């Protein structure tokens, strides 16, 4: 909403749409590891992420032409296992999907992030692919910086 209010002659945007997406599965299964696993293989990228001790999120890179309805959960687990190293593959526990979706990947940045008293933050300012859930971290960081500026200014004037 704020970005649409920015003066068009001052706002510059940069976007990159990637030629692949991530087929993601959220499942009530213990994680492969307590650490993030990024696997870059000839078959494509894979990501293993722990949500809790009993819930995990996994991704495999797929062409943008793939449709989630063309994937079964068994096909997903097989493909994920094929992209993991032997140790991670041995720790992979499979199960039904709570959620299964394909996320198209893109990066986006708007500049400047300030227009007078209006500041762009979060997705209004920048979007990153969902590696390790950094998007929400960036939004929180933006707000953290925005919060400290007026507080610092007020303390300097006191």
Tell me what each language-model feature is.
Residues 1-105, 110:
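Conserved FAD-binding catalytic core of PHBH/FMO-like flavoproteins
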Residues 2, 101-157:
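Conserved mid-domain beta->alpha element of the FAD-binding
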């Amino acid at each position: 909403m704020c970005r649409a209010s920015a003066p068009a002659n001052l706002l510059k945007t940069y976007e990159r749409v990637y030629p692949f997406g991530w087929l993601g599965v959220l499942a009530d299964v213990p994680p492969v590891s307590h650490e993030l696993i990024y696997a870059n293989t000839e078959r494509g990228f894979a990501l293993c992420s722990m949500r809790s001790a009993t819930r995990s999120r996994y991704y495999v890179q797929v062409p943008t032409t793939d449709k989630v309805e063309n994937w079964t959960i068994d096909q997903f687990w097989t493909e994920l296992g094929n992209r993991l190293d032997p140790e991670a593959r041995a720790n992979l526990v499979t199960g039904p999907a709570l959620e299964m979706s394909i996320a198209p990947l893109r990066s986006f940045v708007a500049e400047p992030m300030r227009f007078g008293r209006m500041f762009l933050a979060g997705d209004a300012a920048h979007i990153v692919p969902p590696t390790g859930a950094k998007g929400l971290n960036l939004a929180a960081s933006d707000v953290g910086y925005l919060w400290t500026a007026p507080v610092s200014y007020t303390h300097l004037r006191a």
